[in-house]
Amino acid sequence: VQHALDESPRVLFDRGMDTPAAPFPERLTEGYRAFLDDRFDREKSRYEELADGQTPKIMLIGCCDSRVSPEIIFDARPGEMFVARNVANLVPPFSPDDTLHGTSAALEYAVQALRVEHIVVLGHGRCGGIRAFADDTQQPLSPGDFIGKWITLIGPAAQRSGGRGRNENFDDYVERLCLASIQQSLANLRTFPCVQILEGKGRLQLHGAYFAVATGVLMLLDPASGQFVPAVGEMPKKVQMIRCDEPG
């Protein structure tokens, strides 16, 4: 480790005279030690291979939510998935303008440079970003209202799903909207020319998935029916109640 540090470039910056040095979180240091002693030791040859580059076959677009880690859910090895995470696992439509596009940049790199064969949009239950959109009493968290602007991308999904039903429970509406937003993100993916071309040639496949945090159930979007079905096993009774296309 010291040898690597000796070869690393020295980067200097001004912290500001009044900013005290913050200690690195001990939890992360402990986790890193555990990683070195266990996973890195077991997969050292894999990491040595990855030093020369990555060749993932799957891009996964997920939520920033700390409860939903794609690498853990899918038991992925290093280098298997190219993961992009944002609030509410949203994909904006293709928009070639001069503004900054983090998710679109990740998509471009995955499709054009890495040549991934699959793109998965992974949503999850009780998503805070979806709840914020559904709750019209929410106030901006800052003057910039970055989240508020970002989650306007959910609008078309809400319109397509018919909005909240008159007698629909709020939590059920949020879950239904979570499913509908996955479908909307898939539709937005198909507005990107590179995705259109490669999917049309059969070299790229798009998938929608939904993870229930409390139960660990994974649901997959069935393109034929437009409904979400269990990846393994039987459909839970609660999920059967939640449809993404019909208000209660």
Outline where the language-model segments fall.
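Cationic, low-complexity basic patches in intrinsically disordered or flexible, solvent-exposed regions
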Residues: H3
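Divalent-metal-activated hydrolytic enzyme cores
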Residues: S8-L12, G16-P56, N89-E117, G128-G248
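Catalytic core of membrane glycerolipid acyltransferases/transacylases, capturing the structured
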Residues: S66-L90
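Conserved H-X4-D acyltransferase segment
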Residues: Q54-E71
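Short beta-strand segments
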Residues: I61-C63, R85, L122-H124, H207-A212
